[in-house]
């Protein structure tokens, strides 16, 4: 029997009746509360350890209960009962020790609360005033933050001033939801109305002044000024409105662009961030090299690398310095070689301006260097800069850009429009952060490749250096650059360098694994989201895999750190929210509940922006000049250079040319016994499937040369499932940026695979068939935890893994699917359609065929059990073919222009995220 023992006050009245006979209560000053399980005439078992709840924290059960909806004057309200505590009994110490006075009772009152769920535009605008002093206190904040998704500034002002045009003509109303609740204590209804409107307009001017930047006439702001002059003459609001109008009129020549561009001028002052902006800023790096000659002679830390001489010849070969690669994927990704790449993490975006800076940056490197002293050829190498300095400078750049992000530009309804004609000006502050992300990733790829004379051990030292930089970024809680570095190290052009990774130290690789786990796509990137929640506003990072010195350093110095998140997570969340929830309910009522959900994400962004003010980092001109001057490599250039450094083997080339998949079979056989043909001897790093997220260890140079892994498209800000596909030997297809738009993805692009239905990028480690052979360092322990999983081309127990591709002529994409002995053909076809983003199609319109040879295919009967109907002696390669007798619409290839169907991934949503 179990009895909860609370310490009672003196006297019999203070105790509780025993639940069971034979139980007894006990109290300890140290334990406060104990549980005893006992039986008569037996020794009780006492539970001494338990998790104590802070009595000051809210109770686990929800204090709010929704009971229904009400329709009042054209507005739908969500009705809920909220329990509010009226009296706090006893102090915290008394409650903790169990001595709380029984007379001190916790009294609660149940209140009926209305919150706007949906309504017409007129009613939503009208509700601003009563909500200001009503119970829906957050309504005004949410409305001002999200109204751009369903109306314009001019419409809101027109409706607001029409409804409350003359304060002196307003009659009071006591009914909630009409005009404005008031009390005699605060003056009459007219005074309260003036105060409410003044507060609403004042908040609007202070927090969203860019809404009124409409040069050259500024009609909205002038309309507001006229209203204030008439109804609130001499008020502080009138003064602020006149001041803002004067400022905008004086800055008109500079800001004569669409209102969404207003934040752009604020991005210009910081020279370190110039490369992250539009091409127009590319020339700015030219003056920057001025300080570069000074740094060149003082490479104190440069002793770390023996490749220092390499930079000189590198000037003409572009690979050696480092440039902004254009996008980076998640920990399990293999970003394709360079600026216009398509790999990206869970929440990725496409940046139109990104390619433009390429031509402008390339010429800027030689010219400024030559213009300086004879030191021009002594360009500093990456290893001249200590990892902590590099991480700090990246953090400074990222934090400045993130603080300038206009939060509502992240809304899915705005960000998803950026690629449309005439919308190129949208969200410039977000584009700047994307460009910076791509620049960091490109810098990593270029420096790791070095030039043609760089040896594998030297490249390994550079890789180790970047891993240390990533670790320092983690300490600084800079998740943006951390993600960019990890993604670049997992890019196709880097991860295929088998010899380079063989020389990477065990400790560095272990750190790399730990850091990569942060961005695991498992459960909608739950780990990175939890970290962001845990450390978002904390003073220091909570690290486990770092040395003790790294743990103590921030605390010893007393430096409080901010947090720079990976913005793609939030963009994904908001785009997914925009897709998942309807804009209108019951035909014409604006779904304001959707705006509440969006504001929850926006509020997180604002909170983290304020946390960025905690950083106190001084810019380093030498590093800034070096970083801005780094030359960009295109996707093809970085891939070709990688192939020159470590040429692909002939066997791999033949395999790719014939598009045979037998190599996959052997590659998976390596999981049980290393093969001399597919792997070399020797091993130092063994790891589990989860650890295989580290891109470079996923495959050897032989096969990975022609394989590419990518993820999320930005138009949907969704994360595509990572798949490995046979593609031409070199990425000659259209170059793509890291945060490529999913709507532009197609099988024609090397390594492009369609978005997964689960909307989370599936790492190669979690899709066994997608994994490629590892090199000699990792073959022995390739996947300890996967021994129970079925191997490709082999039926294990009652399940197997098959690969299903679409019946198209412009690519050979496939999706790996787990088939059990219970799966019928329609279920397998539906799985394949979901993987290929064909959710809108019907399974009845498709048929499943097994490819036995180049000229033979086995058709799986409509209702057959695929596990038993398939030919188990042939390759487990299938094709999803549209039936000829149906009037089907054009089959979607690659990623869909719309977001894939969401499954239960936390709102999955959100990309994120976080």
Swiss-Prot record:
Post-translational modification: Phosphorylation of Tyr-814 by MET blocks HRAS binding.
Subunit structure: Interacts with RIT1 and RIT2. Interacts with OOG1. Interacts with TRAF3. Interacts with HRAS.
UniProt comment concerning the protein's domains: The Ras-associating domain interacts with Ras.
Comp. bias (Pro residues): 282-300
Function: Functions as a guanine nucleotide exchange factor (GEF) activating either RalA or RalB GTPases and plays an important role in intracellular transport. Interacts and acts as an effector molecule for R-Ras, H-Ras, K-Ras, and Rap. During bacterial clearance, recognizes 'Lys-33'-linked polyubiquitinated TRAF3 and subsequently mediates assembly of the exocyst complex.
Record-level GO cellular component terms: brush border; cytosol; nucleus; plasma membrane
Keyword Lyase: no
Region annotated Disordered, chain positions: 280-365, 666-689, 728-776
CDD domains assigned: RA_RalGDS, RasGEF, REM
Predominant location: cytoplasm
Residue ranges constituting the N-terminal Ras-GEF domain according to the UniProt record: 112-249
Species of origin: Homo sapiens (Human)
Domain Ras-associating: 798-885
Keywords for this protein: Cytoplasm, Guanine-nucleotide releasing factor, Nucleus, Phosphoprotein
Pfam name, any one: RasGEF
Domain Ras-GEF residues, every copy: 386-648
Ranges that cross the membrane: none
Record's keyword annotation contains Nucleus: yes
GO term, biological process aspect, one: Ras protein signal transduction
Protein name, per record: Ral guanine nucleotide dissociation stimulator
GO molecular function: GTPase regulator activity; guanyl-nucleotide exchange factor activity
Record's subcellular location: Cytoplasm; Nucleus
Modified residues (Phosphotyrosine): 814
Ranges of compositional bias, category Low complexity: 304-338, 675-686, 745-772
């Amino acid at each position: 029997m179990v009895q909860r023992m609370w310490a009672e006050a003196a006297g019999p009245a203070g105790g509780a009746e025993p639940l069971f006979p034979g139980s007894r209560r006990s109290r300890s000053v140290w334990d406060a509360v104990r549980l005893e399980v006992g039986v008569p005439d037996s020794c009780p078992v006492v539970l001494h350890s338990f998790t104590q709840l802070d009595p000051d924290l809210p109770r686990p059960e929800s204090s709010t209960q929704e009971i229904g909806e009400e329709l009042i004057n054209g507005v739908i309200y969500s009705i809920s009962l909220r329990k509010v505590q009226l009296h706090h009994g006893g102090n915290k110490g008394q409650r903790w020790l169990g001595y709380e006075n029984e007379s001190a009772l916790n009294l609660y009152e149940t209140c009926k609360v209305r919150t706007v769920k949906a309504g017409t535009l007129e009613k939503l605008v009208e509700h601003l005033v009563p909500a200001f002093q009503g119970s829906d206190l957050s309504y005004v904040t949410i409305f001002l933050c999200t109204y751009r998704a369903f109306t314009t500034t001019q419409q809101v002002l027109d409706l607001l001033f029409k409804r409350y045009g003359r304060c002196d003509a307003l009659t009071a109303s006591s009914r909630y939801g009409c005009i404005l609740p008031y009390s005699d204590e605060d003056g009459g209804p007219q005074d309260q109305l003036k105060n409410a409107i003044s507060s609403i307009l004042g908040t609007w001017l202070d927090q969203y002044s860019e809404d009124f930047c409409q040069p050259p006439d500024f009609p909205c702001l002038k309309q507001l000024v006229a209203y204030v002059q008439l109804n609130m003459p001499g008020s502080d609001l009138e003064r602020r409105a006149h001041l803002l109008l004067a400022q905008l009129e004086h800055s008109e020549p500079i800001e004569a662009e669409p209102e969404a561009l207003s934040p752009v001028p604020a991005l210009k002052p910081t020279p370190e961030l110039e490369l992250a902006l539009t091409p127009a800023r590319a020339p700015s790096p030219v003056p920057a090299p001025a300080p570069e000659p000074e740094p060149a002679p003082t490479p104190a830390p440069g002793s770390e690398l023996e490749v220092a001489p390499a930079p000189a010849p590198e000037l003409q070969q572009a690979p050696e310095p480092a440039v902004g690669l254009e996008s980076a994927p998640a920990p399990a990704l293999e970003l394709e070689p360079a600026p216009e790449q398509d790999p990206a993490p869970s929440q990725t975006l496409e940046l139109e301006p990104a390619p433009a800076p390429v031509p402008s940056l390339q010429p800027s490197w030689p010219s400024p260097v030559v213009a300086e002293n004879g030191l021009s050829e002594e360009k500093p190498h990456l290893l001249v800069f200590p990892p902590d300095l590099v991480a700090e400078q990246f953090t400074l750049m990222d934090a400045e850009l993130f603080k300038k992000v206009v939060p509502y530009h992240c809304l899915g309804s705005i960000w998803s429009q950026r690629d449309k004609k005439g919308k190129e000006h949208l969200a410039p502050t977000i584009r700047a952060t994307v460009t910076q992300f791509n620049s960091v990733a490109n810098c990593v790829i270029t420096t790791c490749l070095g030039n043609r004379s760089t040896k594998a051990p030297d490249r390994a030292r550079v890789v180790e250096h970047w891993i240390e930089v990533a670790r320092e970024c983690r300490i600084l809680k800079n998740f943006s650059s951390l993600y960019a570095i990890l993604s670049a190290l997992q890019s196709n052009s880097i991860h295929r360098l088998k010899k380079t990774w063989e020389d990477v130290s065990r400790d560095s690789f272990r750190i790399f694994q730990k850091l990569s786990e942060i961005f695991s796509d498992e459960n909608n990137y739950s780990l990175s989201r939890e970290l962001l929640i845990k450390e978002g506003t904390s003073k220091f990072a909570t690290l486990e895999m770092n040395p003790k010195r790294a743990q103590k350093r921030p605390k010893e110095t007393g430096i409080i750190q901010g947090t720079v998140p990976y913005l793609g997570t939030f963009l994904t969340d908001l785009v997914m929210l925009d897709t998942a929830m309807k804009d209108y309910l019951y035909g014409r009522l604006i779904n304001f509940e959707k705006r509440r959900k969006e504001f929850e994400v926006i509020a997180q962004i604002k909170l983290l922006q304020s946390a960025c003010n905690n950083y106190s980092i001084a810019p380093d001109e030498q590093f800034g000049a070096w970083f801005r001057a780094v030359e960009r490599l295109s996707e093809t250039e970085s891939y070709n250079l990688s192939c020159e450094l470590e040429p692909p083997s002939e066997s791999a080339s033949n395999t790719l040319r014939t598009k045979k998949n037998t190599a996959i079979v052997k590659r998976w056989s390596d999981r049980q016994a290393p093969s001399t043909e597919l792997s070399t001897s020797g091993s130092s790093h063994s790891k589990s499937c989860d650890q295989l997220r580290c891109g470079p260890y996923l495959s050897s140079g032989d096969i990975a040369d022609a394989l590419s892994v990518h993820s999320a498209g930005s138009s949907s800000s969704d994360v595509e499932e990572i798949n490995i596909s046979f593609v031409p030997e070199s990425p000659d297809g259209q170059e793509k940026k890291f945060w490529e738009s999913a709507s532009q993805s197609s099988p024609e692009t090397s390594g492009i695979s369609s978005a997964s239905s689960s909307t989370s990028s599936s790492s190669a480690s979690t899709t066994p068939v997608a994994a490629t052979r590892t090199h000699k360092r990792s073959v022995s322990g390739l996947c300890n935890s996967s021994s129970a999983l079925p191997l490709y081309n082999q039926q294990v127990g009652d399940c197997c893994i098959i690969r299903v591709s679409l019946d198209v002529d412009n690519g050979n994409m496939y999706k790996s699917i787990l088939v059990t002995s219970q799966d019928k053909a329609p279920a397998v076809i539906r799985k394949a359609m979901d993987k290929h983003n064909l959710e809108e199609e019907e399974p009845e319109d498709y048929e499943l065929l097994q490819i036995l040879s180049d000229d033979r295919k086995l058709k799986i009967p409509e209702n057959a059990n695929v596990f038993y109907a398939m030919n188990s002696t042939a390759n487990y390669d299938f094709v999803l073919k549209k039936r000829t007798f149906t009037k089907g619409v054009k089959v979607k290839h690659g990623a869909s222009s719309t977001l894939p169907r969401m499954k239960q991934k936390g709102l999955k949503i959100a990309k994120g995220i976080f």
